């Protein structure tokens, strides 16, 4: 008799789990990337792109600097301020950060909102290495 509550709880858990819908796994798509040298070529060729820097303002103006013409929109604010980029919907947006991690996140956010975005591999560290 003292095991009866345990049996009831176990049965409830089993029945409850049987009724759960199977969660479909969403395939993880690879984030599109671009090499720094290819970004430099696009800039030199005056291709109509948007350089979007997703670092903080302090980093943007800091020792690593920023690419001339880049627009600053920190990744932490990207979702809330996404509408500010609507005029660039038809452009390729090259997303930049310090080393490529935050820009990968920013690229995914932009793609989820229908933008044509690519992550600049290596970020400003790689950019400065090629200068």
Regions found by a protein language model. Give the residues of each.
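Short, surface-exposed ligand- or partner-binding patches at beta-edge/loop junctions that are enriched
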Residues: 96
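Rhodanese-like catalytic fold shared by cysteine-dependent sulfurtransferases
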Residues: 2-8, 15-49, 57-92, 101-131
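Active-site flanking residues adjacent to catalytic metal/cofactor-binding acidic residues
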Residues: 52
């Amino acid at each position: 008799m003292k095991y009866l509550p345990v049996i009831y709880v176990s049965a409830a858990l089993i029945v409850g789990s049987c009724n759960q819908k199977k969660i479909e796994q969403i395939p993880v798509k690879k984030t599109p990337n671009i090499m720094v040298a290819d970004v430099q070529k696009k800039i030199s060729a005056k291709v109509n792109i948007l350089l979007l820097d997703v670092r903080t303002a302090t980093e943007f103006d800091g020792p690593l600097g920023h690419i001339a013409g880049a627009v600053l929109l920190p990744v932490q604010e990207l979702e809330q301020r996404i509408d500010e980029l609507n005029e660039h919907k038809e452009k390729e947006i090259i997303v930049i950060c310090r080393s490529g991690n935050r820009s990968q996140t920013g690229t995914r956010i932009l793609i989820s909102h229908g933008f044509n975005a690519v992550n600049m591999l290596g970020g400003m560290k790689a950019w400065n290495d090629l200068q």
